């Protein structure tokens, strides 16, 4: 447990986490789609890059589920949308542009509107016509 300082800082730290996850998740999905379209074995590619600088919990856990078309939720897309929305609002109030977060949030909202809100966040891969 880390002490984040004054009241409210823990909430802002949670928003930082969601912002970072949005980018990592989108990056993993885009890497997988590129690999598939380049004729690579996606599982082998994930093993290769997950131990290097691209490695993350999103790469190690969520991407491997997406590669298997396993959309069972570890974290619901609808809850991720809620958290990203809060982060986006907080950033806007501070005059901070978060382009990647806004893009991922928009894509996730589209997927939720298509009935995928109760699936895991790895369903983001479906945006790319996986």
Give residue ranges: language-model regions.
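Helical "substrate-binding/catalytic lid" subdomain
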Residues: 9-130
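Ligand/cofactor pocket segment of small-molecule handling proteins
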Residues: 1-7
């Amino acid at each position: 447990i880390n002490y984040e300082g004054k009241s409210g800082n823990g909430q802002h730290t949670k928003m930082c986490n969601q912002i970072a996850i949005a980018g990592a998740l989108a990056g993993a999905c885009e890497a997988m789609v590129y690999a598939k379209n380049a004729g690579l074995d996606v599982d082998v590619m994930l093993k290769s890059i997950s131990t290097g600088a691209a490695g993350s919990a999103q790469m190690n856990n969520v991407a491997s589920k997406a590669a298997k078309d396993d959309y069972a939720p570890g974290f619901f897309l609808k809850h991720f949308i809620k958290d990203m929305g809060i982060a986006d609002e907080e950033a806007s109030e501070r005059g901070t542009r978060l382009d990647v977060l806004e893009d991922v949030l928009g894509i996730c909202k589209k997927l939720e509107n298509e009935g995928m809100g109760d699936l895991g966040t790895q369903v983001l891969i479906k945006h790319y016509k996986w």
